[in-house]
Amino acid sequence: MQQIIVIEPIVTDRLILKALVKEDASAILHILSDRDTAWWSDDFKMRSLDEAIDFIDWGNEAIDVIHYGLFRKESEKAIGYIQIKLPKCSGIKDARELGYALSKNFRKQGYMSEAVNAICDHLFRDESINRITLEILNNNLPSLGVARKCRFSYVDEPIEKKHKRFLDDQPVDLYVRRRPDTDMSLAA
């Protein structure tokens, strides 16, 4: 029996993070069809409204992933999204991996850092989640900035242990944010 996961809205100072709906497909298509945005993603470059609708449906099924749409409080148009990989996708029960994309019209305004911090706080309400991870290409300066602002720590791994990006086999760097009340002396 499939577990039903409710995508609860999360409200920050400037944003509402909530489930995407089919009416958001054109905004998601605009974001993920942008060549510069798609390059950083391990996903594909979106080409059609039907692909955007499939993407939204996939995130709402909450089997492998959950998608939170990012909306400014004063607008009904999605400006980005955050993807949360669930254990069925990642194979890891005590961690969640995040991925995200933001419309280029809203970059360098702190929206993604605000959203990632809110998602982390929300996820850590579940006591079974001990860490949240990001996998970032080492030349993705905007994502590296989000990781730093959101208190993620770089994990130094040998090159042979690094995950490879599906798209082109480039190694990605791992960043981790641990549950605030985790005692690191017990983790050794």
Which residues does each PLM region occupy?
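Acyl-donor (CoA/ACP) binding surface of acyl/acetyltransferases
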Residues: 1-35, 67, 71-188
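Conserved GNAT-fold acetyl-CoA-binding loop/helix
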Residues: 36-58
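A short hydrophobic/aromatic micro-motif that marks alpha-helical segments and, especially, helix-coil
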Residues: 48-50, 63, 166
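A short helix-loop-beta-strand connector motif used in the catalytic cores of GNAT acetyltransferases and
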Residues: 57-69
